[in-house]
Structures are given as C-alpha cells and as structure tokens.
Amino acid sequence: MSLFGAFWDKDPNPVGHGQFGNNKGLFFNLNWYPKGVLHIGAWDAWEAKQYAHYCGNNSVFLEANPNSYNRFKNEIEQFDQKIYNLAAWNEDDLEMDLYCPDHSQDSSSLVEKVGTPIKTKTITIKTLFERENLSFSNYDLLNIDTEGAELQVLEGIGENISNFKYIIIEVSDLGSDFDKQVNEKITSQGFSHVRDSTHYRSSVTSKMFCDKLYVKN
C-alpha cells in the first residue's frame, strides 16, 4: 500500500487523514485520477481493487517473490489486471537471489541481504513492455516499492518514465547517497518532488524510509 494512505476513500483501510487532514484518498487530494497504473512490487495486491475503481483492468503489477505471487495473484486477476512473477531490474533474464525476511515477507529484497534467499528472474520494464506488447502511453501512474532496488528499476524504465504523470516511490534509506541518486534520477527526467509521506524506521534494516510523491513538470 502507499504510505500516503488509501487511494480511494471508500476503502475500509486507513485513508489519508494522517497525511492530508481528511478522510479522502490520495487521488481526491491530488484532484487527479489515473487512466492506468504500473505497480512494481505487488506484495498482497491491496491496491488492485482501488485501481480497478478508477481505471478498470488497465493496471500492470510485478512481484518478484514467487510465494507472494502465487498467494496473491488472484487479488489482481479478479479485476482482469495483469501480474508478472518477475523482478524489475536494470538487466534482463538474470537469475538472482531475493532475500525474504522470515517475519516480513513484504520486505523481500534483491539488495538488502536479510532473510532466506529464493531465486527470481529479472527483467527491465522496457523489455517487459516490448515482450508483452504493452504501451507506456496507456499508463500515467508509476508506483515502485522494491526495498532498495529503486534505482535499478528506474534505469530499466529509461526515458519511458516521461509517459507518467505521477510517481510514488518508496525510498528505503532516507538521507543516504542512494536516496539522493534516486531523487536526481527522477528529477532529471522532468519531475518535481511534491512531498514525503510520514517517515518510518524499518524493522528489518533499521533504516528510515518513506514514500515520495513526484509530479511531471
């Protein structure tokens, strides 16, 4: 889920009161609604029903963890949305270790080597769209939650990032060189930082993290 709260105020989960001072969802507070979503790091697919409310079946999810994929894919497919059991990265077709913390499967990471490793296969988003005959022009919201692999994911999207209007990205080490590199990568492509969500400390890495919201200039 987004750390900005639910996208839809009718969702039974907490909405944006802590972020925006009201009980409406993120899109209401932005006065903007997506036509299509690329969501990288699906985990439990909590957002699928919210995306469906706004853009029907026009959402694409990636989930690197095969266990999470098998457990939650029906949450996405019930809305005829697409999900791929692949790890977004900056190289195609590598077999890599995905580290899965025993009590925090939602924090599985290619970068943070904490937990039990399982094998996953990588793909760049550029290649995924080519192979699956998808068009970047159909998606205007990019949501990235990849536990430390955000820079590699962005590199794998390349200049296609310019097709998105808004980017929500979880940055897993606030104030670090990595954080600055992610920000520079996004802003260099014509986006401006809007705001951070509340900052939290990871129970897995002890690093500070939050969601960052960007809008295309």
Where do the PLM segments sit?
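Phosphate/nucleotide-binding beta-alpha loop and adjacent structural elements of enzyme active sites
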Residues: 1-217
